[in-house]
């Protein structure tokens, strides 16, 4: 061990490893906060109700709404359930999931094809009439339409 400590190569490699690892750690840690602030910088009066935006503000604002809270909880749960059905050891469960998914997709496509006229753009119909029949975003606390397309 004494011979190893005397060699200058050992000290250069140790110093180089320490410097490179510290540079990498600093480079990875520093821009994350500034990048987050740049992405969520308020560019208009309506972004996060005019406040300087951050991820914490967005999450806190979103979770105050009961519907958003349900979606926040349901999204990971639905992904986990989908993965459980797809990767289940019991082939009957997996096949049931695939058949149900295929059936729902076919029913949706048939419903869209029945209602869409030949002269109308299918994507426009799906967006305006089927998915967004109210013509705007509804306020969950009151039944009135907040924004209406003209």
UniProtKB/Swiss-Prot annotation:
Coiled coil: none annotated. PROSITE patterns: PROKAR_LIPOPROTEIN. InterPro entries: DUF3713. Belongs to the MG307/MG309/MG338 family. A lipid is attached at residue 28 (N-palmitoyl cysteine). A lipid is attached at residue 28 (S-diacylglycerol cysteine). It is found in: Membrane. Its main location: membrane. It comes from the Bacteria. Disulfide bonds: none annotated. It comes from Mycoplasma pneumoniae (strain ATCC 29342 / M129 / Subtype 1) (Mycoplasmoides pneumoniae). Keywords: Glycoprotein, GPI-anchor, Lipoprotein, Membrane, Palmitate, Signal. Residues 1-27 form the signal peptide. Pfam families: DUF3713 (PF12506). It is a lipid-anchor; GPI-anchor. This is Uncharacterized lipoprotein MPN_442. GO terms for cellular component: side of membrane.
């Amino acid at each position: 061990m004494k011979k190893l400590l005397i060699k200058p190569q050992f000290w250069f490699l140790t110093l180089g490893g320490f410097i490179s690892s510290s540079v990498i750690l600093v480079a990875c840690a520093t821009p994350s906060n500034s990048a987050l602030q740049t992405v969520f910088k308020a560019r208009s009066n309506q972004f996060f109700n005019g406040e300087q935006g951050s991820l914490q503000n967005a999450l806190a604002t979103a979770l105050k709404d009961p519907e958003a809270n349900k979606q926040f909880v349901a999204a990971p749960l639905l992904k986990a359930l989908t993965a459980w059905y797809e990767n289940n050891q019991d082939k009957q469960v997996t096949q049931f999931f695939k058949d149900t998914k295929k059936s729902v997709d076919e029913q949706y496509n048939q419903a869209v094809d029945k209602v869409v006229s030949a002269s109308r753009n299918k994507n426009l119909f799906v967006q305006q009439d089927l998915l967004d029949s109210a013509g705007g975003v509804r306020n969950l606390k009151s039944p009135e339409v907040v924004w209406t397309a003209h």
